[in-house]
Amino acid sequence: MTAIAPVITIDGPSGAGKGTLCKAMAEALQWHLLDSGAIYRVLALAALHHHVDVASEDALVPLASHLDVRFVSTNGNLEVILEGEDVSGEIRTQEVANAASQVAAFPRVREALLRRQRAFRELPGLIADGRDMGTVVFPDAPVKIFLDASSEERAHRRMLQLQEKGSSVNFERLLAEIKERDDRDRNRAVAPLVPAADALVLDSTTLSIEQVIEKALQYARQKLALA
């Protein structure tokens, strides 16, 4: 009988710290990593590379089904590898972002990418970062964590990130954008942003990232009986 690889899902709103936590857990456990938020950008970039029309659902479905992408976390940095090439920076361009929003609108593309995401489930295990990993993509995952934080704290973290990059930011505007996105995500008809019924809800508002990582790893190891 073939062993089924365990999955740890990390869901939650934007700015809660999911990416940092997932990278740390993948490195600590030496497991595979899936950044579901980057998948649509990677597909959009692949379409641009192969001159596939991003407005054609029929053309995009086979590309989505066989998307050659890997996520590698090294020393806290996430590398996105498309067809053997590091495209971590390239997927963050505005051109790719615009194309990604187009490809994400097609139901058959979303279905193909759902199957592609599930194919990341390989031994020794998978850390899956997203918004509906525990509810839609891996509903049978043995460990589910919903990482949350207050909208004010998430706006504060985002402001610090932008300031470090030299950007001038308005806290009130950031907070309003986060609240608007939260409302949209939590009330959408398909795959709303809600914790799975069997998820550990971990509030990181008053915790350091080190404390969040420690709590998440401790919970996962207990659930999976890992040493």
Swiss-Prot record:
Compartment(s) of residence: Cytoplasm
Recorded superkingdom: Bacteria
Binding site for ATP: 12-20
MF (Gene Ontology): ATP binding; CMP kinase activity; dCMP kinase activity
Pfam family of the protein (one): Cytidylate_kin
This enzyme's EC code(s): 2.7.4.25
UniProt entry keywords in alphabetical sequence: ATP-binding, Cytoplasm, Kinase, Nucleotide-binding, Transferase
Catalytic reaction list: CMP + ATP = CDP + ADP; dCMP + ATP = dCDP + ADP
Chief location category: cytoplasm
SUPFAM superfamilies from the UniProt entry: P-loop containing nucleoside triphosphate hydrolases
GO CC, alphabetical: cytosol
GO biological process: nucleobase-containing small molecule interconversion; pyrimidine nucleotide metabolic process
Keyword Protein transport set for record: no
Matching CDD domains: CMPK
Xref: InterPro entries: Cytidylate_kin, Cytidylate_kinase_dom, P-loop_NTPase
Family the UniProt entry places it in: Belongs to the cytidylate kinase family. Type 1 subfamily.
Classification via NCBIfam families: cmk
Protein name: Cytidylate kinase
